[in-house]
């Protein structure tokens, strides 16, 4: 592998000083590379993955690729295959380390080249520290069976919120289509897709955020037995709330921030669960713009929240990092990992966020410019976000 491309100079290397670095995980290329995820391994290595191929759902050559950054190194290792379902596109991978230090890879295999037919898959590994490529020791599919309460919740939610003026023309036909589709047991069991890291509650419960392009809503897969069995939460209903990112407040409430796949004004959507992910409030607009693009929110070790997002209504040409000191009531500080003119042809999208054991924040995202496409890795600390320079 070539040396990583250092795009920004190191501004400081100790706590209390601003720090930002950016690297390309691999050289720019013509292939479509997108939807990355990053995780820190127990030994301090970083592992990243993304999907790679000639397209997305309609390209059967798409597979999951990965790379490892060993602790203390400034160069990502050789790219390797992580998952490939023969003759089907594999997309939207998510990496996660559970409380037992088991490595999980969640992703979707797209059947019939349609998002709404996607199959939710996972594989796990306990042998991944001393090898470049994880040795996977288990693989299965996750099949959720939302019951009649699923359709009842959707219908009730739309009936309660249908009269809001901003939805006057759009919502009635939209909501009727969703309500009717929700009554079909077969449709309810397929098409649930990954995008953002799961979270683990103090009880050990795992919450895996999912969404459906068919229903244009979200849901959470819940496991209370370390991922051996999964069941569906009540749906997160709204006008296009998809790709949820979950974060838990000090009072136990869980907030889902979501991409806006609905009507204007384009805003990040927000829903709250007060019962550990079982049920969710109707998704509402926040003040933060969103051009129908993925986001991620992360709770830092000190309790502050960080959000990575495209903060425009129509372009993915800038990637903002927002900081909240009050659990998302307001986002007081903003800094840009990259900011370009809307018509520049440069896109920065689909962030994945973690905080490593040394306190640094790691971000991977899709970068496209005139050189081609790559997955970018940015490293920064909270002081960099706070620094106005």
Residue positions per predicted region:
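Universal eukaryotic N-terminal targeting presequences
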Residues: 1-2, 16
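Sec-dependent N-terminal signal peptides
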Residues: 3-12
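Asp-box/BNR beta-propeller blade signature and adjacent active/binding-site loops
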Residues: 14-389
């Amino acid at each position: 592998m070539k040396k990583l491309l250092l795009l920004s100079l190191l501004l400081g290397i100790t706590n209390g000083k601003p720090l930002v670095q950016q690297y390309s995980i691999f050289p720019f290329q013509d292939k479509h590379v997108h939807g990355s995820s990053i995780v820190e391994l127990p030994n301090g290595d970083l592992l990243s993955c993304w999907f790679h191929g000639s397209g997305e759902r309609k390209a059967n050559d798409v597979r999951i690729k990965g790379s490892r950054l060993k602790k203390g190194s400034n160069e990502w290792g050789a790219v390797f295959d992580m998952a490939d379902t023969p003759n089907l596109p594999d997309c939207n991978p998510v990496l996660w380390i559970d409380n037992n230090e088991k490595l999980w890879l969640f992703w979707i295999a797209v059947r019939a080249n349609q998002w709404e037919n996607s199959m939710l898959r996972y594989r796990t590994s306990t042998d991944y520290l001393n090898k470049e490529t994880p040795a996977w020791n288990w693989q299965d599919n996750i099949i959720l069976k939302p019951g009649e309460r699923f359709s009842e919740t959707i219908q009730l939610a739309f009936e309660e919120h249908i009269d809001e003026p901003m939805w006057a023309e759009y919502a009635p036909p939209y909501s009727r289509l969703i309500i009717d589709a929700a009554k079909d047991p077969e449709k309810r069991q397929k098409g649930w897709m990954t995008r953002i890291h799961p979270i683990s509650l103090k009880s050990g419960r795992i919450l895996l955020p999912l969404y459906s392009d068919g229903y244009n809503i979200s849901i959470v897969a819940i496991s209370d037995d370390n991922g051996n069995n999964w069941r569906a939460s009540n749906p997160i209903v709204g006008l296009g709330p998809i790709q949820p990112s979950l974060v838990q407040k000090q009072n136990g409430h869980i907030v889902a921030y979501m991409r806006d796949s609905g009507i204007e004004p384009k805003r990040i959507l927000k829903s709250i669960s007060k019962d550990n992910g079982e049920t969710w409030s109707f998704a509402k607009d926040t003040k933060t713009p969103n051009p129908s693009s993925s986001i991620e929110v992360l709770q830092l070790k000190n309790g502050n929240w960080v959000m990575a997002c495209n903060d425009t209504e129509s372009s993915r040409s800038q990637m903002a990092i927002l900081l909240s000191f009050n659990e998302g009531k307001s986002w007081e500080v903003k800094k840009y990992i990259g900011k370009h003119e809307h018509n520049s042809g440069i896109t920065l999208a689909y962030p994945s966020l973690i905080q490593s054991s040394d306190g640094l924040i790691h971000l991977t995202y899709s970068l496209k410019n005139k050189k081609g496409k790559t997955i970018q890795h940015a490293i920064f600390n909270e002081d960099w976000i706070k620094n106005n320079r």
